[in-house]
């Protein structure tokens, strides 16, 4: 699962902070919304044509702000807590697969008091491991011995969630309340 909180303010302000390090000014935080979802290194390279080294530095600057401030600049989507509760009551097992580093994902779940709904939380590694959404989903499946997964479904609000599910031969549900589109 991914797409539980609206991270727009936190992510875009952290991207803005990283860009400022390079003397780049963003005119409007909404211009930075494409950074929501894909790996940061890719986004800095793709959208600002950063070299690998510049993208690495930008990611470090991003995380510098995110760790203390940006992590809390997001909000739970309306009705999400009730939805999670209902899913658990119906017997579903929920696991989180996010592009955010695992350490940040766990802090966000704790902050919103929803960690108890998830039996497993996985994200990218601060060391660059589990780089793509497909890598993260594969890690979730392997760590939980889910080798035969006809009842496993990836729910997400970005194309990267759906692509990652397909890479792992999972069914997926794309939701439109977040930052995805058709």
Residue ranges and their predicted role:
Residues 1-34, 48:
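Active-site neighborhood of HAD-like aspartate-dependent phosphohydrolases
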Residues 18-19, 39-52, 108, 140-142:
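Helix-loop "lid/cap" segments that line or gate small-molecule binding pockets
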Residues 25, 115-119, 147:
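Conserved H-loop
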Residues 45-82, 90-92:
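Metal-dependent phosphoesterase signature
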Residues 83-109:
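Substrate-recognition element of Asp-dependent hydrolases with the DxDx(T/V) motif
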Residues 115-130:
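A short, structured active-site edge motif that brings together acidic residues
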Residues 133-162:
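Conserved Lys-Pro-Asp/Glu-containing loop-to-beta segment of HAD-superfamily phosphomonoesterases
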Residues 153-182:
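Acidic, Mg2+-coordinating phosphoryl-transfer loop and its flanking beta/alpha structural elements
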């Amino acid at each position: 699962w991914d797409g539980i909180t609206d991270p727009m303010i936190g992510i875009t302000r952290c991207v803005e902070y990283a860009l400022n390090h390079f003397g780049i000014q963003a005119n409007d935080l909404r211009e930075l919304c494409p950074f929501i979802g894909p790996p940061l290194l890719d986004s800095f390279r793709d959208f600002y044509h950063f070299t690998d080294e510049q993208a690495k530095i930008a990611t470090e600057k991003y995380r510098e702000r995110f760790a203390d401030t940006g992590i809390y600049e997001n909000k739970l989507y309306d009705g999400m807590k009730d939805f999670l509760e209902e899913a658990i009551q119906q017997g579903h097992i929920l696991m989180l697969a996010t592009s955010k580093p695992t350490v940040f994902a766990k802090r966000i779940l704790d902050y919103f008091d929803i960690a108890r709904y998830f039996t497993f939380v996985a994200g990218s590694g601060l060391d660059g491991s589990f780089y793509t959404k497909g890598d993260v989903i594969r890690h979730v499946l392997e760590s939980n011995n889910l080798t035969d997964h006809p009842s496993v479904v990836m729910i997400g609000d970005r194309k990267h969630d759906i692509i990652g599910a397909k890479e792992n031969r999972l069914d997926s549900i794309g939701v439109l309340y977040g930052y995805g589109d058709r």
